[in-house]
Curated annotation (Swiss-Prot):
A lipid is attached at C555, C562, C565 (S-palmitoyl cysteine). Residues 18-529 are extracellular. GO terms for cellular component: host cell plasma membrane; membrane; viral envelope; virion membrane. Homotrimer of disulfide-linked HA1-HA2. Interacts with human CACNA1C. Residues 551-566 are cytoplasmic. Belongs to the influenza viruses hemagglutinin family. Residues 1-17 form the signal peptide. One of its GO terms (biological process) is viral budding from plasma membrane. This is Hemagglutinin. The keyword Disulfide bond applies. The record marks R344, G345 as: Cleavage. Keywords: Clathrin- and caveolin-independent endocytosis of virus by host, Clathrin-mediated endocytosis of virus by host, Disulfide bond, Fusion of virus membrane with host endosomal membrane, Fusion of virus membrane with host membrane, Glycoprotein, Hemagglutinin, Host cell membrane, Host membrane, Host-virus interaction, Lipoprotein, Membrane, Palmitate, Signal, Transmembrane, Transmembrane helix, Viral attachment to host cell, Viral envelope protein, Viral penetration into host cytoplasm, Virion, Virus endocytosis by host, Virus entry into host cell. Its main location: virion.
Length: 566
């Protein structure tokens, strides 16, 4: 009996066997990503794909400063409003910045024909040559070119007029018919602007042009229009009851434009030979110009980012990330981050059987932890880690390269009468934006799911690699660990890690230890059976003695009568 109890104690005592475990890296990262199946999954490493910051400034693009119109509008700048005189010398720019409430536009009130289309044309222009299309002194010898000024276009307290137009008036009591032409020899498109004056009454018409009925004719290969002044009293705007309507056309190289009139012509003085440049544009912004360089400019500020997406502003100029409405686009590159032994939630542990990551393993994503008589330690599996890093890096770079189409996205111009078209355009743009946002988010969700599954598979493969080497020389004890049936020193452990484990070398020792352990189990079972029998017999005797004592007590006090019949 003593021998059996000794065997039992030996079986119950813990064995100090050598072990090796397969595990994965964990750290103190708080990065979270979303997948198709889960939200806010904490991971060890991730990359952000969404730029959400800007510097709040207007910066140079490719070393070229923008054209800041200040208090002037596009109309004020291109017509030459006297209050915009500082802009006359500007010849090149990376983009044009206009404030939302620019004060100086058309100083003399009137209608600017096809203004939105002109803005659209200028948005693709990066420089121009301003030149005299009809020199002031020599082109109009029979007309007055100095008295055409107005208080509405005053400059430094004096009446003035646009710097790029001439208001031709009567000279010496007459306004002879005029005919003037220009041939475009610039080898570029030339922007030509002019106007037609509409007086408020017939007296002004006669005073300025010496005739009641007048006309203005403008003709080129692609433009042909005849204007008749509309004389009528109108509400005062900028203290003017008259109006000037403004017109423009683009003259192709080699084309000719002809002006004919017998009154009311606001003649071209300066024209512009346009140079178009990819990436230019017009933005409306209150931001100030700063001494900074950027690759991408938005109305909010400049963006310096190589990320494929941004949520700063849909209007961009330069090499810009694609705008999406997302608030988070983060792609996982590492593993699920579970630093301690805890559940991974609905989907269990990583690789299906390992409950927690190792913060002690810092030199790789997957690896080993061993324990033997010589000590314990962590070691990364460099080959599987490097293969995973290469694969994921290539995938992330591929995603960024495919989605990182840098481009300019400027707003489209519509006038007040085209409100329905503008609303329709917004709906179309919103639809495209929703599609882009959905595609970006779905791409990230799918790739995150694939990456985490990829890591799970790598851990599982590493486990199976060890299992296939050890075979029955060790037993699986759960949580990714194996317990050796033989002594495994550091050299032995290293052979398991590098795939050179010598199974036959340790198989005999393992077999003997397995048989000993199996024998201990059988002896333990015999002891447990003996103890069970003794326990049953002892319990029965105690029960019988108790019943006898109770019966004797009851018979002695008369509570129980006992009769024996023969």
């Amino acid at each position: 009996m003593k021998a059996k109890l000794l065997v039992l104690l030996c079986a119950l005592s813990a064995t100090d066997a050598d072990t090796i475990c397969i595990g994965y890296h964990a750290n103190n990262s708080t990065d979270t990503v979303d997948t198709v199946l889960e939200k806010n999954v904490t991971v060890t490493h991730s990359v952000n794909l969404l730029e959400d910051s800007h510097n709040g400034k207007l910066c140079r693009l490719k070393g070229i400063a923008p054209l800041q119109l200040g208090k002037c509008s596009i109309a004020g700048w291109i017509l030459g409003n006297p209050e915009c005189e500082s802009l006359v010398s500007k010849k090149s720019w990376s983009y044009i910045a206009e404030t939302p409430n620019s004060e100086n536009g058309t100083c003399y009130p009137g209608y600017f024909a096809d203004y939105e289309e002109l803005r659209e044309q200028l948005s693709s222009v990066s420089s121009f040559e301003r030149f005299e299309i009809f020199p002031k002194e020599s082109s109009w010898p029979k007309h007055n070119v100095t008295r055409g000024v107005t208080a509405s276009c005053s400059h430094k307290g004096k009446s003035s007029f646009y710097r790029n137009l001439l208001w031709l008036t009567e000279k010496n009591g007459s306004y002879p018919n005029l005919s003037k032409s220009y041939v475009n020899n610039k080898e570029k498109e030339v922007l030509v602007l002019w106007g037609v004056h509409h007086p408020s009454n017939i007296e002004n018409q006669k005073t300025i042009y010496r005739k009641e009925n007048a006309y203005v004719s403008v003709v080129s290969s692609h433009y042909n229009r005849r204007f008749t002044p509309e004389i009528a009293k109108r509400p005062k705007v900028r203290d003017q009851e008259g109006r000037i309507n403004y017109y423009w056309t683009l003259l192709e190289p080699g084309d000719t434009i002809i002006f004919e009139a017998n009154g009311n012509l606001i003649a071209p003085w300066y024209a512009f030979a346009l140079s178009r440049g990819f990436g230019s544009g017009i933005i409306t912004s209150n931001a100030s110009i700063d001494e900074c360089d950027a690759k991408c400019q938005t109305p909010q500020g400049a963006i310096n980012s190589s990320l494929p997406f941004q949520n700063v502003h849909p209007v961009t100029i330069g090499e810009c990330p694609k705008y999406v409405r997302s608030t988070k686009l983060r792609m996982v590159t590492g593993l699920r981050n579970i630093p301690s032994i805890q559940s991974r939630g609905l989907f269990g542990a990583i690789a299906g059987f390992i409950e927690g990551g190792w913060t002690g393993m810092i030199d790789g994503w997957y690896g080993y932890h061993h324990q033997n008589e010589q000590g314990s330690g962590y070691a990364a599996d460099q080959k599987s880690t490097q293969n995973a890093i290469n694969g994921i890096t290539n995938k992330v770079n591929s995603v960024i390269e495919k989605m990182n189409t840098q481009f300019t996205a400027v707003g489209k111009e519509f006038n007040k009468l085209e409100k329905r078209m503008e609303n329709l355009n917004k709906k179309v743009d919103d639809g495209f934006l929703d599609i882009w946002t959905y595609n970006a988010e779905l791409l990230v969700l799918l790739e995150n799911e694939r990456t985490l599954d990829f890591h799970d598979s790598n851990v599982k493969n590493l486990y199976e690699k060890v299992k296939s080497q050890l075979k029955n020389n060790a037993k699986e004890i759960g949580n990714g660990c194996f317990e050796f049936y033989h002594k495994c020193n550091n050299e032995c452990m290293e052979s398991v890690k590098n795939g050179t484990y010598d199974y036959p070398k340790y198989s005999e020792e393992s077999k003997l230890n397995r048989e000993k352990i199996d024998g201990v189990k059988l002896e333990s079972m015999g002891v447990y059976q003996i103890l069970a029998i003794y326990s049953t017999v002892a319990s029965s005797l105690v029960l019988l003695v108790s019943l006898g004592a109770i019966s004797f007590w009851m018979c002695s006090n008369g509570s129980l009568q006992c009769r024996i019949c023969i």
